[in-house]
Curated annotation (Swiss-Prot):
Name of the molecule in the record: Turripeptide OL71
Record flagged with keyword Secreted: yes
Domain of life: Eukaryota
Keywords from the named record: Disulfide bond, Ion channel impairing toxin, Neurotoxin, Secreted, Toxin
Length: 99
């Protein structure tokens, strides 16, 4: 299987690590940290969407929606990655996008 389509992106940084199982967007395949440790969260990144973002500090990622701690994945939503993420209700969002 190719790793070209997706990779795991570490929030709060420009680090992107290859993670082949990100090709399955229906399951929780990226590693993650504690729900309160949002700076350590990993997100499944759509590499093809990176070029649509204005610069290297805003990378397109699919935000992982969480319904609860035992069944964390409710869906994905594409955003441009900013500098930091934080918890907002049932999902993680870029701090700069909270308004």
């Amino acid at each position: 299987a190719s790793c070209a389509a997706r990779a795991c992106a570490l929030s709060g940084s420009n680090i992107t690590v290859t993670y082949c199982s990100c090709t399955d967007g229906t399951t929780h395949v990226c590693p993650d940290g504690d729900s309160h440790e949002t700076n350590d969260m990993y997100f499944c990144e759509n590499i093809s969407g990176v070029a649509a973002c204005p610069d290297t500090n805003t990378v397109a990622v699919e935000v992982i929606y969480r319904d609860d701690s035992t069944n964390p994945i409710e869906g994905f939503q594409l955003h441009c990655r900013c500098s930091t993420y934080e918890s907002s209700g049932l999902h993680y969002v870029c701090e700069e996008l909270i308004g």
